[in-house]
């Protein structure tokens, strides 16, 4: 009788092992994409960002212009730092217009900063101003952008200059870059010049009211 009971228990154990399926082992690679999908990275092509200098292109500036909305006078700026130095933002001076973007603070060598500006809504003035960056050699890089409201009287202009010592962008710097320091017309052409202090620049500015300005600063 005991042997019969034991045989019944053994048979029941074998049956349960066969009848119950083994728990499925789903590896990480085999899981549905809804479980394992990676978050989509946001584009870095936005005003206020710092990107690889080699990635700076007009397509990047086009995205910034789009993000600024349907404003008649606006500008997307990209400046590549190939100077061998680190830059730190000082400030922005606006002769006219404004920006919703914080000027990127730290721009290491081989990086480029992106910035956007526009005319003030409801005004009949353009987007005109100066950016200032202090460089690790103790000097300041001043950058002019000028996108006028009335193209019957004015044109697009840009400029770049190295100032000795630490300077802030202000009305004096604007007047110097716009009137006296050999500014470049925004005429859809590349312009190059020596900046002194072992540096040179190469830049391109479009001529329309939705303006792109790309500048590369490198060692001479």
UniProtKB/Swiss-Prot annotation:
* Chain segments carrying region Trp-rich region, which is important for the binding to lipid membrane: 146-161
Q: In which tissues is it expressed?
A: Expressed in tentacles.
Matching entries from Gene3D superfamilies are given as: Cytolysin/lectin (2.60.270.20)
Where on this chain is Cell attachment site, crucial for protein stability (motif)? 185-187
Q: What is known of its domains?
A: Composed of a long N-terminal alpha-helix and a core region rich in beta-sheet structures. Before the pore formation, the alpha-helix binds the lipid membrane, partitions into the lipid-water interface and stabilizes the monomeric molecule on the membrane. Finally, it traverses the bilayer, thus forming the transmembrane pore.
Similarity comment: Belongs to the actinoporin family. Sea anemone subfamily.
Quote the subunit structure annotation.
Answer: Octamer or nonamer in membranes. Monomer in the soluble state.
**Record's protein name:** Deep-sea actinoporin Cjtox I
Summarize where phosphocholine binds, as residue positions.
96, 128, 146, 148, 174, 178-179
Report if keyword Metal-binding is assigned. no
* Gene Ontology terms describing biological process: cytolysis in another organism; monoatomic cation transport; pore complex assembly
Please give the InterPro entries that the UniProt record associates with this protein.
Answer: Actinoporin_PFT, Anemon_actinoporin-like, Cytolysin/lectin
Ordered alphabetically, the record's keywords are:
Cleavage on pair of basic residues, Cytolysis, Membrane, Nematocyst, Secreted, Signal, Target cell membrane, Target membrane, Toxin
**Site (described: Interacts with the lipid membrane):** 201
GO MF annotations in UniProt? channel activity; toxin activity
Q: Where is it localised? A: Secreted; Nematocyst; Target cell membrane
Q: Where is the signal peptide?
A: 1-19
Q: Where is this site: Important in the initial contact with the lipid membrane?
A: 154
Q: Name one GO cellular component term.
A: nematocyst
């Amino acid at each position: 009788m005991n042997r019969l009971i034991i045989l019944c228990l053994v048979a029941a154990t074998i049956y349960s092992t066969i009848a119950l399926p083994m728990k499925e082992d789903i590896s990480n690679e085999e899981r549905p994409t809804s479980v394992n999908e990676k978050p989509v990275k946001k584009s870095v092509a936005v005003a206020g960002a710092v990107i690889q200098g080699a990635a700076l292109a007009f397509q990047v500036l086009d995205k910034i212009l789009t993000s600024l909305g349907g404003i008649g006078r606006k500008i997307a700026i990209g400046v590549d730092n190939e100077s061998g130095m680190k830059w730190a933002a000082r400030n922005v001076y606006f002769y006219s217009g404004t920006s919703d973007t914080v000027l990127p603070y730290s721009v290491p060598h081989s990086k480029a900063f992106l910035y956007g500006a526009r005319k003030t809504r409801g005004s009949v003035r353009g987007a005109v101003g100066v950016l200032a960056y202090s460089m690790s050699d103790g000097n300041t890089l001043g950058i002019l952008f000028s996108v006028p409201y009335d193209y019957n009287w004015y044109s697009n202009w840009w400029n770049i200059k190295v100032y000795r010592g630490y300077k802030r962008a202000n009305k004096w710097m604007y007047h110097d870059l716009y009137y006296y320091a050999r500014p470049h017309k925004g005429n859809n052409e590349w312009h190059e010049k020596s900046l002194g202090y072992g540096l040179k620049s190469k830049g391109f500015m479009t001529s329309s009211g939705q303006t792109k300005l790309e500048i590369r600063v490198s060692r001479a």
